[in-house]
Design a protein with these regions (language model features):
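Short helix/turn-capping signatures at newly exposed starts of structured segments
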Residues: 2-181
Length: 181
């Protein structure tokens, strides 16, 4: 954990009890609202202590990320994972969360270091509607489906985009919410 947290705390609820709604107003988890961008401390207070995975950013990647997120925005990339909940997030500076993710299936070919040990087992909705139904109104972008939602963008990554007649046929690996670019 790199010594990020002095005291480890568990989430005050189980993965099955986790209820998440994504809306134009942010993310609501078990009745408590979080914005994206949000300081890590707010997420820790709500979800418990995560596991951290630090990433070295090579110069090409840093240049791309700074073009996207602003000069100096990429200083200490750390992804955090709440293994028991199936939730993860991305930071560019180790403290400000710019993307939340909910993992439904972990593609072994990707071998993501920050993939949760358990998959998300709670309830996920978009504007109160089941996410699988709502995301279909988004744009099909070959390997993901993207749904604009006010200042946010919700993306769902296909498990097997080329395995059926429709990319949605193979299911999804994860759903992420971030500020729209």
């Amino acid at each position: 954990m790199f010594g990020f947290f002095k005291h480890k705390t568990a989430a005050p609820f189980t993965g099955e009890q986790c209820t998440v709604d994504i809306s134009e107003n942010g993310i609501t988890i078990n009745g408590l609202k979080l914005d994206v961008l949000v300081h890590l401390d707010a997420a820790v207070k709500l979800l418990g202590t995560p596991r951290g995975t630090k990433y070295k950013t090579d110069s090409d990647c840093e240049e791309f990320l700074e073009e996207t997120h602003g000069k100096g925005a990429v200083s200490n990339r750390v992804n955090y994972t709440w293994d028991e909940l199936g939730i993860y997030c991305y930071t560019m500076n180790g403290k400000v969360i710019h993307c939340f993710g909910f993992m439904f299936a972990n593609d072994p070919e990707l071998a993501l270091k920050h993939a949760p040990e358990k998959m998300f087992r709670g309830t996920l909705t978009i504007n109160g509607e089941p996410w699988q139904q709502a995301i279909k109104r988004g744009e099909n972008c070959d390997i993901i489906r993207v749904l604009p939602l006010g200042v946010y963008s919700v993306t769902a990554e296909y498990s097997d985009p080329f395995g059926g007649e429709d990319p949605d046929d193979g299911g999804y690996n994860c759903v992420e919410v971030q500020l729209a670019e």
